Amino acid sequence: MKLKMKTTLIFAALVASLTLLSCEQKRTLKLYTWTYYTPENVVKAFEKEFNCKVVVTEYDSNETMYNKIANGGAKSFDMVVPGQDYISIMLQKDMLQPINQELFTNRNLISQKLIDKKSVDREMIYSVPYYFGASGICVNKKKVPAGDYERSWNIFADSRFKGHASMMDDYREVIGDALAYKGYSVSTIDDKELAEAEAIIHNEWLPNIVKFDAESFGKDFARGDLWLCQGYAECVYGEVPEEEWDETIDFFIPEEGGPSYLECMCILKESKNVDLATEFMNFMHRPENYAQFLDGFRFPCYVNTEAEKYMTKKPMYPASILDHCEAKVDLGENLDKYYKIWEGIRIK
């Protein structure tokens, strides 16, 4: 009896030891990314397949992310998802490490059209595209009939929208829109071109704009307070009931283009789980997984060439309207030119 009990205790101790060892060996991937940007079901599927734990910490801006990483947070995370203008800065500061191309087997699924728009790291040595998008224009068709207005950034000069129009509180976006309307690069540093953009905003657009806002414009549009707004489609569509989308919202990006953003997955130089981070990039770009991300936000398929066939929901807008958009680049010290223009606009 004692022998049996002793054997049982030894077996129990062995099981406990193996369980503890298993827990100790379970890897943890620490992902620092945008708020609500990673589908929970995809994360859980990754955890199950790779026997790991994913800890997601969220940020609301590139500036927040960068400041945290630059001020002692680099060792706290494995991966980040910065905009490409910040990728440029992080590469200069030696914050990122190269991606193991042998593990990133889904590289061939990244759209060449998208790669051509990359202004930084087109070879994808340090960054894997996650999402490409742009702000656009939303018109409330209940207030102004569709087809009865200019489908251009200069729609903000239309006095019918006076007191019911808003633009984002973002100087690269607003000034970039004016530059695109004039036919210039959204990242120009030419003083003459910037002066022309400033004049358009001051003289033509500003008289009709009730506020600059990057947070509540979706709610204001849904309430009917705004008839015209510049912003991200998901912020408006997310506030208007889906059954009212077609009759209420006309979202478009003008043919003259405008500023766009490209956010990419990157591995930090201090990462403790480099291979696992690379596997996560590869996992996200399995077409069926990437389609879940797109469906979750009703985004169009622009980055991954095969994901569209797995999508189950109609996107808010067609991917083709992004073709004319230009990715913003880091302007370094020349950013002050934009900031000074913006100060003058905001004062008025």
PLM feature spans:
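A ligand-binding cleft/hinge motif common to bilobed small-molecule-binding domains
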Residues: 86-89, 228-246
